[in-house]
């Protein structure tokens, strides 16, 4: 009987020879990387290595920074998003972003989650209610807030606010979720809830997460990319990366010799 061949996941992103400058500063240098569908890709590296810059290129949030120039290719589902004809609103609808600290709008819990669908034209009240409920269920927040949906979101705890922001990103029905250090401002219990949530969400979404926490990267990710001084040093299966990395600089970083 022949051996069963593992099915390789499709690559949602293919990044080829990506370079980025802030003015004269060369921040990303010849980045080549793929991000597989329905997996968690962890992006690690010391402060200033380019990891947050990189993740913001994936839905072109980086374009909000003045004097940014990019060359190369960022292919999302076969389309180079660096093409000037790309619809940025549609791209950011399909590639959501969650930042380091929960940043709910000064509105109700309901209005925070409904914000994205509304700006994308969803007006039917029943559909909007269903979309909000589904997003809150997906982030395991529904049972905690269903009786106070019209209360101020800023009254939630830090961990709840971060889950609310994830729900807000999910409400537009994205394919990809980008997370820039989403647990760095949270306590250990809230961090664990977010990690458990990410492992559940990868059944439906492709996730890329920037993290300074090596234990977190090893716990939740399928592949890990190590950045250093604007270069991608190594991208590998997470188990291999943390047990026998190919590059000595990767080993030095994950074992705490610098960073």
Curated annotation (Swiss-Prot):
Q: Name the SMART domains on file.
A: AAA
Q: How does it sit in the membrane?
A: Peripheral membrane protein
Q: What class of enzyme is it?
A: translocase
- Main localization (coarse): membrane
Localization: Cell membrane
Swiss-Prot/TrEMBL GO biological process terms: phosphate ion transmembrane transport
Question: Recorded E.C. number(s)?
Answer: 7.3.2.1
PROSITE patterns from the UniProt entry: ABC_TRANSPORTER_1 (PS00211), ABC_TRANSPORTER_2 (PS50893), PSTB (PS51238)
Which is an annotated Pfam family here?
ABC_tran
Query: Which SUPFAM superfamilies does the record cross-reference, listed alphabetically?
Result: P-loop containing nucleoside triphosphate hydrolases
Keyword Nucleotide-binding set for record: yes
Domain ABC transporter: where?
Answer: 7-254
Residues that bind ATP: 45-52
Gene Ontology CC annotation, any one: plasma membrane
Spell out the reaction equation it catalyses. Answer: phosphate(out) + ATP + H2O = ADP + 2 phosphate(in) + H(+)
Similarity-based family: Belongs to the ABC transporter superfamily. Phosphate importer (TC 3.A.1.7) family.
User: Function, please?
Assistant: Part of the ABC transporter complex PstSACB involved in phosphate import. Responsible for energy coupling to the transport system.
Question: Could you give the subunit structure recorded for this chain?
Answer: The complex is composed of two ATP-binding proteins (PstB), two transmembrane proteins (PstC and PstA) and a solute-binding protein (PstS).
Name under which the protein is recorded: Phosphate import ATP-binding protein PstB 1
Annotated organism of origin: Bacillus licheniformis (strain ATCC 14580 / DSM 13 / JCM 2505 / CCUG 7422 / NBRC 12200 / NCIMB 9375 / NCTC 10341 / NRRL NRS-1264 / Gibson 46)
The gene that this protein is the product of is pstB1
């Amino acid at each position: 009987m022949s051996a069963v061949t593992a099915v390789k996941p499709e690559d949602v992103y293919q990044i080829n020879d990506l370079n980025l400058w802030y003015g004269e500063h060369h921040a990303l240098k010849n980045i080549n990387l793929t991000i597989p569908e329905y997996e968690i890709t962890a992006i690690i590296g010391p402060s200033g290595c380019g990891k947050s810059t990189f993740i913001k290129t994936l839905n072109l949030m980086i374009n909000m920074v003045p004097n940014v120039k990019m060359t190369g290719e960022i292919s999302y589902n076969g389309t180079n998003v660096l093409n000037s004809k790309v619809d940025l609103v549609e791209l950011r609808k399909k590639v959501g972003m969650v930042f380091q600290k929960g940043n709910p709008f000064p509105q109700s819990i309901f209005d925070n989650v409904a914000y994205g669908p509304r700006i994308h034209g969803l007006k039917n009240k029943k559909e909007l209610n269903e979309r909000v409920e589904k997003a809150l269920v997906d982030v395991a927040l529904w049972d905690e807030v269903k009786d106070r949906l019209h209360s101020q979101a800023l009254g939630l705890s830090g961990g709840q606010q971060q889950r609310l922001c994830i729900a807000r990103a999910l409400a537009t029905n994205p394919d990809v979720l980008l997370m820039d250090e989403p647990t760095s401002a949270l306590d250990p219990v809230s961090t664990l809830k977010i990690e458990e949530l990410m492992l559940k969400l990868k059944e439906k979404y492709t996730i890329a997460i920037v993290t300074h926490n090596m234990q977190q990267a090893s716990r939740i990710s399928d592949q890990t990319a190590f950045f250093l001084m604007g270069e991608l040093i190594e991208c590998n299966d997470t188990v291999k990366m943390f047990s026998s990395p190919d590059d000595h600089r990767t080993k030095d970083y994950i074992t705490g010799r610098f960073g």
